[in-house]
Amino acid sequence: MAATLSVVVPVYGTKRDLPACLESLRTQSLRDAEFLLVDDASPDGAGAVLAEYARRDSRFRVLTHSQNRGLFAARMTGADAATGKYLAFLDSDDFVSVDFYRAAVALAEENDFDLVMGDTVWQRENGDCFVRPVHADCVLEDELRGNAVRDAFFQQAMTCYSFHTIWNKVIRRDLWLRCAPYYAPLAKKHIVMTEDIAFSVVLYFFAQGFGRHRGDGVFYCEHASSSTGAAGNPAKFRKNYADIAQVFAFADEFLHQQGANQARQQLQKARKWYARMWAEQARKAANQPEISRLTAALCPDFSLDGDANLPEIFWFDQPMTPWRDGTERIKRAILGLDGIDCPVISLDVFDTLILRPFRTPIDLFHTLEGKWQRAARRNMTSFAQARTEAESCARAWLPETQADVTMWNIYSAMMQNLGVSDDCVGQMTYNEREAEIHFCRPRKTGVQLFNLAKAAGKRVVLTSDMYLDADTIRRMLEKCGIRGWDGFFLSNEQNALKWNGALYRKLTAQLGVKPDNVLHIGDNAKIDVEAAKKAGLHALLLPRPADVFMDADCTQMANLGHGCLAGFTTADSMQPLALRCAQGLAANRFFDDGYAPATADSAFAAYPSRLGYYAVGTHLLALAKWLLCRCRADGVKRLVFLARDGALLRQAVELLRTDADAVETDYIPASRRCLLPALMANPTDWAVLPVRWAVYTPEKALKLLSFCTLDAPESELRHQAEAAGFPWQSPFQQKTRWESFLRFFRDKLYDGCHHQAAYSAARAYYEEKLPEGSACFDMGYSGRLQAALCQLTQRAVPVYYVHADGRNSERLSAAYDFPVHCFYPMPPAMSGAFREFLLSSDEAPCVGFERQNARVVPVYAQDGRNEAAHFLSNCVQHHALQFVRDFHDTFAGTGVMQSLDNPGVQLAMSLPFEGALRQLPEADAELLRNIPFEDMVFAGENALDLRTLVRDQSAEAAVAAHEMGAVDAPSRMIGFIPEQTGLVKRTIGFLLFDRETFRKKLRKRMKRMSNEQ
């Protein structure tokens, strides 16, 4: 009978690491599997280890090559012998988490996926384990269908290692059999390097369903002797280079046969990426001529110096976060692998199997306020307060014979406290039960533990302290897909509680088992762990997501923005219900696994998804609600979002728009570059062009001013500039030099006819796109661009800004008579490049307009984007928009969503974003290393490094805050980085920003000096 899963393990020279690999297979939770061990003529005696495992366990089968044929061929040999419905590959020096294959196969079966991808955890030789957050986020969606599978794979151009490796996947064998004939040419060759790409290109091309399973996967063990660690071995290095060239040639030919030209273009990007990466490594193993020869063979049209648009070498690998093993230990305990083998598994229900989208359970009561006011016929009492006080009274009034309260007890106490009617109590009891069912969601990690225990043949029981009745809880469990438990122990039915051990004792008595035969798993350290252990049970903690989110020893996410309004308002005022609900959503999303990677010195653990979802997403939601409210109040019928700042916000507005919002939206280009004809219409405005003159050279300046420059060869322009004393490629060192150059340009090189033609084209375009009654959205700030638009359209066009600069905007608003409405009443401390990078589209900028067939159309710059910046921007913005979608889907029609019409709530919702701008911890700032922010006008063609920019601005903001008397804040939250600062500056920094640390270090220093004396 065929197995469900076949796992192929090629073996060559890995005898030392082989036992860990094979043990991880032997102990897999999926028992219906076969393990095909391919001995590729391993020279180190590994065959004896394979034979021993095959002798002890019939699921292991050994296949032998008489001579070494390479990794690609060994995998093909194993795959040809496979019988399973699904297929997986595992390298013999790696190992797999205990429940990966069962969970991945289950996901594929439930959703008809062809491919399921798990996590990758890197293990160093010293045993330390870590994840690479960028790789973990490389797939934006956890489910892809149809051509979206192919598109997602090729668009990332092999930059994300985890996407194209074959050994962290489970593959439907029907898909493999379709792909296998294409592999035949390579199977005859000896290939050991990047063979994953050859397999994956074909698999992803034909796959129609892709799923992402999180929380389980493969441990990739780093070894200096591995196939990728060849820098110190020239012969091995040359062989690897040759393999890579063959793999890319194979992949390109396959795509050519399929007519997949767009995929081929992306593959060429990947080829350049690998050429650059290996050329860097080659410096250690080869001389320069040989590097050139090898690189030319791999990618003939590649230039190491010329391809500046390629991402920084290893950027995708750089941010690293420690992996935490808590959930893996729970899974192993359920399976009885680490000395404890309990036949009964007990699981808590609320916050272990079921989640609500709230930071605290009481927040659910706040969502019922509107229904309370209708049921109670309007009163001054808050339902959340009344409900909380009623439960406290009910517990105080319980008779000694009753252990726990019920809903009847609670609402009876409310009747006594407030004198509300039976009808009101009946309505609110019903409303609360229905709200619990409506808001509940499965906790994926908890459900996986439940299913794992069932698959392992354990008796699975549910144990809960809860006032809700059993029928309501069963409805919640069924909604969350949880069925088939073997016992349900509910405190108000059993008349016993967990905290004193009584409910645990009833459980063991009714099941007829000894306490040490039960493993209990729950989210509360005292009730689910300490109390269970006191009752004689084994117990393990699965931390509640919201508790992890709020724990500063795990993450600084909840602390973001706390210092932004310090001294102006209270902490409670900065935590309205909407923000608490946002925190609940974020906690459930990122800490569903209570041991998900997180560190105390970071907010996002360097995950772009966390930065996007929580920090950018909350601000995006607030901005969108503000815009809709303002447009409704101002009677705006057409709102035009200006590129590139408005692209993301427009999508959020469209998500939230209701029938009450009649505003029509559009999106048009309006860059500094394309508006230069209007910005320079008046000669007096030339001196205040929005440029950083210090980064410009005459060459760059004339490219910028090409729309109004005389027709002449570049050589002639250069000759005239240098003859006038302006060296062609020398930056302007002083503002006076820049001003002198502009005067020279106006006198010698300016063409008024060209300028007028460019102005007329821009005017025709904007008159059509901004008809009467239109308003604009732009990020801000000075009003120059809006003034230019008003000048071109010859009418006052209102504008909505995130914020204005407070000086020029007022002056220009008055001069050109356009109203300015700002989300923030004053400029925030951190603005500019980082804000725009997070919120703006990274599409190619508009550089001007041209006439085509009696129409004016925008002209865009060539797409020379940095792939790393593109990935980071897309990932952050995708998850920000997902937050808006989740918040709307969860809270639409409730008071939570309605509260976002309040400007104070909008401001509070933006504090995490402002905190991320100003207080980004250094561990998260690693995401910005070598990420350029490009502004063709402001910065010329120079790219601003975001990490450096953010560090400088946050330090300036911290100093300014201190000068204004702001309270102390933890040094790691304000951009002061002690590890990267000299002794004197470090001392001053601690004194200014972290006085407690300063005092501790001072005492330590004085004590050491005293001992030395």
Model-based region annotation:
Residues 65-82, 89:
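Glycine-rich, basic loop-to-helix element that forms the pyrophosphate-binding segment
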Residues 404-408, 413-462:
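Short, acidic loop-to-helix structural element flanking the phosphoryl-transfer center
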Residues 147-233:
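Conserved nucleotide-sugar donor-binding catalytic segment
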